[in-house]
């Protein structure tokens, strides 16, 4: 696992635990990825990225080349940032869509920064302007469920008339529940484009494999959204085939 610390304190929503290695059928490599905003920093704060063992497996794991990019996000930039500890329906994240009412799987955000391009109420983030938005989401997972898998999807435009944003899925939240592997995480980084002003965005989790209780444990999810200039200096594409 990797986690970000500022002045020795763990940053809420800044953890990645999806680097599972099975050591079977040639699967002996993995990686952890994280992209988030560190709000409220002061001059001379110290940022650390720590890597630590997340299971009881005694096989040594060696690191290849890691990379780190840090950028100051000025107050003038139009961004939304927040954290979450549960969904509308509660802390349980491992539920199928057909088991619940529309909206119950959506994560409830506590905002720590809301720019002029955004509105916010609970689980709903309103993208006020038509255009493109960079979206980063991190969701920690914990639970004693054998072969559990929790996914994430970005729902754009409301439940009645909207749909999943193009490319708006993440599905790396696998939990083996062997050798103390009871933690994982889901991560999304991508660009979404609105076709009209004032479209609502919600982030949902959903069950993809075994049934059982999966929550965030004692950690938090995080989200970062920034309105980007899609008229110049930007490339974005989608793919459906190899």
Predicted segment positions?
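Extracellular beta-strand-rich recognition modules
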Residues: 1, 32-36, 44-53, 131-141, ...
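Terminal (often C-terminal
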Residues: 1, 56-148, 172, 213-242
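Glycine-biased low-complexity/repetitive sequence motifs
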Residues: 6, 12, 41-46, 126-127, ...
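Acidic glycine-/aspartate-rich tracts in secreted/extracellular proteins
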Residues: 10, 53-56, 208-210, 231
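Exposed beta-sheet edge/beta-hairpin loop segments within beta-rich domains
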Residues: 36-42, 60, 124-126, 190-196, ...
């Amino acid at each position: 696992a990797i986690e970000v610390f500022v002045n020795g304190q763990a940053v809420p929503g800044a953890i990645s635990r999806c680097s599972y290695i099975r050591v079977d059928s040639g699967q002996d490599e993995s990686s952890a990825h994280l992209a988030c905003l560190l709000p409220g920093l002061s001059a001379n704060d110290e940022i650390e990225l720590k890597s630590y063992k997340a299971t009881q497996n005694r096989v040594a794991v060696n690191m290849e080349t890691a990379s780190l990019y840090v950028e100051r996000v000025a107050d003038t930039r139009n961004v939304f940032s927040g954290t979450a500890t549960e969904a509308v329906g509660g802390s349980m994240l491992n539920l199928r869509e057909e088991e619940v009412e529309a909206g119950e799987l959506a994560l409830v955000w506590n905002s720590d920064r809301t720019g002029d391009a955004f509105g916010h109420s609970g689980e709903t983030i309103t993208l006020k302007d038509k255009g493109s938005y960079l979206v980063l989401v991190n969701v920690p997972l914990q639970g004693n469920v054998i072969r559990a898998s929790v996914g994430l999807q970005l729902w754009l435009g409301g439940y009645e008339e909207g749909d999943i944003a193009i490319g708006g899925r993440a599905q790396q939240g696998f939990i083996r529940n062997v050798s103390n592997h009871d933690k994982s995480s889901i991560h999304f980084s991508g660009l979404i484009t609105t076709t009209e002003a004032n479209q609502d965005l919600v982030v949902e989790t959903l069950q993809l494999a075994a049934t059982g209780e999966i929550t965030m444990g004692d950690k938090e999810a995080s989200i970062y959204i920034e309105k980007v200039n899609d008229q110049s200096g930007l490339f974005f594409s989608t793919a459906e085939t190899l």
